[in-house]
């Protein structure tokens, strides 16, 4: 942002609002990028160590014209702190990304995917659906995803049952 733009935002009183809004954007992009990287197999691919752009492009880009698109998407991963780029090699940077690469943490990956896909719809669409009288149904859920995430919730369900059932 140049000085003139910053000055205009300050004069209009919007700078503080903009900064507050931007604090929400990065974690949201971080979540979406992490889920997309997991779904696409990138996290599993990088679990074994750093890979060059060429190695990643080989199995992720069918049309050579999309190589810049992949590079921009990988750069987003770097910017949101999930990837590291050293030289020309990408690796997993964050603790969370490295841990999601482990099969034992699939339920946690599924919870994140559920939040990024289903929960976002529940939150975003609820007011409109209520106004139209259109409830969510089981068909709005991804059963496989819910099944993948459910082992993580099992101890909480057991705890709730233990509190209610003698």
Predicted regions and their residues:
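Short, basic interhelical loop/turn and adjoining N-cap
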Residues: 63-67
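A generic structural signal for short
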Residues: 31, 61-62
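Long, low-complexity, charged/polar intrinsically disordered regions in eukaryotic proteins
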Residues: 1-26
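Conserved Class I S-adenosyl-L-methionine-dependent methyltransferase catalytic core
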Residues: 9, 23-28, 34-40, 44-47, ...
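A broad structural signal for alpha-helix termini and local helix breaks/kinks
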Residues: 60-61, 165
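Short acidic, hydrophobic short linear motifs in intrinsically disordered regions
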Residues: 49-60
């Amino acid at each position: 942002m140049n000085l003139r733009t910053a000055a205009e935002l300050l004069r209009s009183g919007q700078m503080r609002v903009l900064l507050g809004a931007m604090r929400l954007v990065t974690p949201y992009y971080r979540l979406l990028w992490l889920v997309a990287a997991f779904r696409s197999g990138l996290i599993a691919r990088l679990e074994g160590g750093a890979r060059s752009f060429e190695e990643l492009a080989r199995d992720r880009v069918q049309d050579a014209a999309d190589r810049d698109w992949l590079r921009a998407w990988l750069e987003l991963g770097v910017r949101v702190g999930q990837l590291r780029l050293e030289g020309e090699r990408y690796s997993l940077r964050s603790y969370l990304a490295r841990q999601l690469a482990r099969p034992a943490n699939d339920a946690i990956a599924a919870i994140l995917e559920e939040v990024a896909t289903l929960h976002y719809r529940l939150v975003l669409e609820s007011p409109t659906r209520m106004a139209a009288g259109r409830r969510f149904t089981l068909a709005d859920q991804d059963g496989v995803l819910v099944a993948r995430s459910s082992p993580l919730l099992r101890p909480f369900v057991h705890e709730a049952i233990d509190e209610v059932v003698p």
